[in-house]
Amino acid sequence: IEFRNLDNAKFGYKVFRENHYFAINWLRVRNSLHLVAQAEEWFSPSRIRQIKKGLKNGAKVREAHTAKEIRDFAHMLHKVYSAKIRRHFPSKDFFQQLEKQMMRSRQSRIFIVTYKDKIIGGSACIYSDKSAYLWFSGGMRKTYALQYPGILAVWYALHDAKQRGYHHLEFMDVGLPFRKHGYREFVLRFGGKQISTRRWFRFKWEWLNRMLIKMYE
């Protein structure tokens, strides 16, 4: 059992401990868009060069608008997504439901990277108040290395969020603080800052739970 997204580290502390939960610090990466005139000001010089090269080499980025584009985006993402980023990847129907239920109210957007009319990358964002959250992103970087599809997908999500007046964009699920995480290193080069939050866990196997409580307390 897991509880997450608790911004206040002290919230529920006593109750969680009494019920044999243990806490692990979890990392998030957040770009503060309201502090700069352009989202790109936070990017590393190498990221800027890669974005310019990708666009110069024929890649285009825009918001998805049709059901077919969303299906093609989901199909592409399923093929390239690494289990190291997110183990439980949703079904392709999930993105169709996202389009039907959320995009109409502008609570989410899907961006696609295209090359010669083929979707080679993209990202999915959700929005709440003044914050944008990058939920999924990926690209066919091995097949289309010169177009930098994964980089363009993240860049455009940040660029669009800034243009629409969001104060922050947060990258979801970038991993444990003590484990090397390729996706976290990738997104940090877009200029975001690491933030540590607390997650509470409890396993059904008592012996394992006791061992982990001792390990993390």
Tell what function each PLM region has:
Residues 16-38, 166-217:
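Active-site/acyl-donor-binding loops of N-acyltransferases
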Residues 49, 156, 182:
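Short Gly/charged-rich anion-binding patches and loops
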